[in-house]
């Protein structure tokens, strides 16, 4: 019971902290006349991935490497299969040609890069599979390249978009209070969440990798799921694609990059199956959008994606 309360309370603090940090930082940036484009691509993007970042970094520091990796791998699988699948069940998703030819292949590439980093035992000179500090720097280098690419395409399309970030205006003292409170919520909530998840793993007799791949991953992805389904209910399901692409790239390149830089991450029970499902889920997202019904992910395909996630999760639990 205590572990469940720690998990729920920690997640609530993390989400509240992420919102506070994002709102406060964006208000300060706006006061210093930083453009909405830069705010959206940096502060807001960081805020949406802050739960995964905090949990993975704290897990790495606490010696729970499997939970750190499982959180990222599981979140990305959840995003690609459950979020896109549930959104398509509400309303079919039309995918732009640029997204199909450029952005989704980047997600596939990120999954392949992670696979190579996880399996380069000889290069790391380790006796076990590990995402080393050097791998972390490689992932962060890819993140910088991705951000440079994102800024370039955003500037090119800025005039066409015409939509600004909705940023709360507030006094400087209030912004600082939001930032400080947000950071405190993220750190304290993250520690509670990691402690609760580790405790549940021990009490249930399951590995931390399974907890990370399922419970932790699903919990940290709930904001993206809620945002995407709400957008579909408002007849704008395409937002889900942007959410998933941005989140998945951020998770692998930045979250895992930072976590591995803080402390090398042995793969442990995160095996070839989990990494293969990660790659397959990215490929499936590309295939259903590219080859069927003129770049539209239909309700039937959405049901297929949700079904794939349910089968994968059931397999993980059955193996314990």
Q: What are these regions, as identified by a protein language model?
A:
Residues 1-320:
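Hydrophobic alpha-helical segments, chiefly the membrane-spanning helices
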């Amino acid at each position: 019971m205590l572990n469940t309360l720690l998990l729920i309370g920690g997640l609530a603090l993390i989400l509240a902290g992420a919102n506070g940090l994002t709102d406060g930082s964006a208000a300060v940036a706006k006061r210093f006349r930083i453009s909405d484009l830069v705010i959206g691509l940096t502060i807001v993007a960081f805020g949406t991935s802050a739960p995964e970042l905090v949990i993975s970094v704290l897990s790495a520091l606490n010696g729970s490497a499997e939970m750190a990796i499982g959180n990222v791998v599981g979140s990305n699988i959840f995003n690609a299969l459950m979020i896109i699948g549930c959104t398509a069940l509400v309303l079919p998703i039309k995918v732009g040609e640029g997204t199909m030819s450029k952005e989704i292949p980047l997600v596939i590439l990120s999954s392949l890069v992670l696979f190579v980093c996880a399996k380069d035992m000889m290069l790391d000179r380790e006796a076990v599979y590990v995402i080393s500090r050097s791998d972390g720097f490689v992932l962060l280098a890819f993140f910088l390249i991705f951000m440079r690419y994102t800024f370039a395409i955003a500037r090119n399309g800025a005039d066409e978009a015409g939509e600004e970030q909705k940023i709360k205006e507030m006094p400087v003292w209030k912004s600082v209070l939001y930032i400080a409170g947000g950071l405190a919520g993220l750190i304290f909530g993250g520690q509670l969440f990691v402690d609760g998840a580790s405790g549940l793993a021990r009490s249930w007799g399951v590995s931390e990798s399974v907890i990370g791949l399922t419970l932790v991953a699903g919990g940290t992805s709930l904001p993206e799921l809620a945002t995407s389904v709400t957008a579909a209910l408002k007849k704008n399901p395409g937002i889900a694609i942007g959410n998933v692409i941005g989140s998945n790239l951020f998770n692998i390149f930045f979250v895992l990059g930072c976590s591995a830089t803080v402390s090398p991450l042995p793969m442990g029970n995160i095996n070839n199956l989990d990494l293969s499902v990660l790659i397959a889920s990215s490929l499936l997202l590309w295939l259903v959008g590219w080859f069927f019904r003129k770049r539209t992910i239909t309700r039937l395909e959405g049901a297929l994606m949700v079904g794939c996630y349910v089968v994968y999760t059931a397999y993980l639990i059955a193996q314990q």
